[in-house]
Amino acid sequence: MAGRRGDPDEQLLTTVRTIKILYESNPYPNLEGSRQTRRNRRRRWRARQKQISSISERLLSACLGRSAEPVPLQLPPIEKLNLNCDEDPGKGTEGGLGSPQISVEPCTVLESGTKE
């Protein structure tokens, strides 16, 4: 089904190719001329790069159907987070990303300055 019309992956690849062509159409300015001339070329180049960047963001948001801004991740308060020393190494993270491990008893990670 890779060739069907409206395939989201193919549409994304086409959008990325278009963005690549946009960036390639604006090469870095050459280093010839006086200092002021080079400065003006770089200033115009940066302005074009900004325009290309904003166009690229608009293309990607239209293609992906969402905004370019990341969705904020809700994290629990840092005071409640703790290292869980009692966790079985074979279990892994079965709880997933949404359920952080909160230990009731504080575990001792470093001993109090005694050497053996």
UniProtKB/Swiss-Prot annotation:
Chain location of the short sequence motif Nuclear export signal and binding to XPO1 per the record: 73-84
Pfam family, one: REV
Coiled coil: none
Molecular function via GO: DNA-binding transcription factor activity; RNA binding
Ranges where the record places region Disordered: 26-48, 84-116
Presence of the UniProt keyword RNA-binding in the record: yes
Basic residues composition bias: residue spans: 36-48
GO terms (BP aspect): mRNA transport; viral process
Major localisation: host cell
Modified how: Asymmetrically arginine dimethylated at one site by host PRMT6. Methylation impairs the RNA-binding activity and export of viral RNA from the nucleus to the cytoplasm.
Subcellular location: Host nucleus, Host nucleolus; Host cytoplasm
Residues bearing the modification Phosphoserine: S99
GO cellular component: host cell cytoplasm; host cell nucleolus
Further remark: HIV-1 lineages are divided in three main groups, M (for Major), O (for Outlier), and N (for New, or Non-M, Non-O). The vast majority of strains found worldwide belong to the group M. Group O seems to be endemic to and largely confined to Cameroon and neighboring countries in West Central Africa, where these viruses represent a small minority of HIV-1 strains. The group N is represented by a limited number of isolates from Cameroonian persons. The group M is further subdivided in 9 clades or subtypes (A to D, F to H, J and K).
HAMAP family reported in the protein's UniProt record: REV_HIV1
UniProt note: domains: The RNA-binding motif binds to the RRE, a 240 bp stem-and-loop structure present in incompletely spliced viral pre-mRNAs. This region also contains the NLS which mediates nuclear localization via KPNB1 binding and, when the N-terminal sequence is present, nucleolar targeting. These overlapping functions prevent Rev bound to RRE from undesirable return to the nucleus. When Rev binds the RRE, the NLS becomes masked while the NES remains accessible. The leucine-rich NES mediates binding to human XPO1.
Subunit structure: Homomultimer; when bound to the RRE. Multimeric assembly is essential for activity and may involve XPO1. Binds to human KPNB1, XPO1, TNPO1, RANBP5 and IPO7. Interacts with the viral Integrase. Interacts with human KHDRBS1. Interacts with human NAP1; this interaction decreases Rev multimerization and stimulates its activity. Interacts with human DEAD-box helicases DDX3 and DDX24; these interactions may serve for viral RNA export to the cytoplasm and packaging, respectively.
Protein's job: Escorts unspliced or incompletely spliced viral pre-mRNAs (late transcripts) out of the nucleus of infected cells. These pre-mRNAs carry a recognition sequence called Rev responsive element (RRE) located in the env gene, that is not present in fully spliced viral mRNAs (early transcripts). This function is essential since most viral proteins are translated from unspliced or partially spliced pre-mRNAs which cannot exit the nucleus by the pathway used by fully processed cellular mRNAs. Rev itself is translated from a fully spliced mRNA that readily exits the nucleus.
Protein name per UniProt: Protein Rev
